[in-house]
Amino acid sequence: MDYLLAFVCGGAICIVGQLLLDIFKLTPAHVMTSFVVIGAILDGFGIYDKFIEFAGGGATVPIVSFGHSLLHGAMHQAHIHGFIGIGMGIFELTSAGISAAILFAFIVAVIFKPKG
């Protein structure tokens, strides 16, 4: 049942993104940025943690979770170190994902030739 719930919740997030692309003709960059900001806003109000408890992996895999992780780390470090902790905490939870994205993008760029 957990897998089904994660699939449905993650799929619902993807459906919203696809509708934004198709109906409102937003660019993928606008949709991605909007989802990151929405994730940060929901985390700021404490809603996204409850959604993660409900949806499991369906809430942690999409890009919305990236905004949640950015703000969650910043708020945690701000409580510990004050204002300077905001800058430290932003990348605390997301540094592994950012590093992996850079590494895999580099590997793909080395292996394949660009078109054009």
From Swiss-Prot:
It holds the Pfam family SpoVAC_SpoVAEB. It comes from the Bacteria. One of its GO terms (biological process) is sporulation resulting in formation of a cellular spore. This is Stage V sporulation protein AEB. Keywords: Sporulation. InterPro entries: Spore_V_AE, SpoVA. It comes from Bacillus subtilis (strain 168).
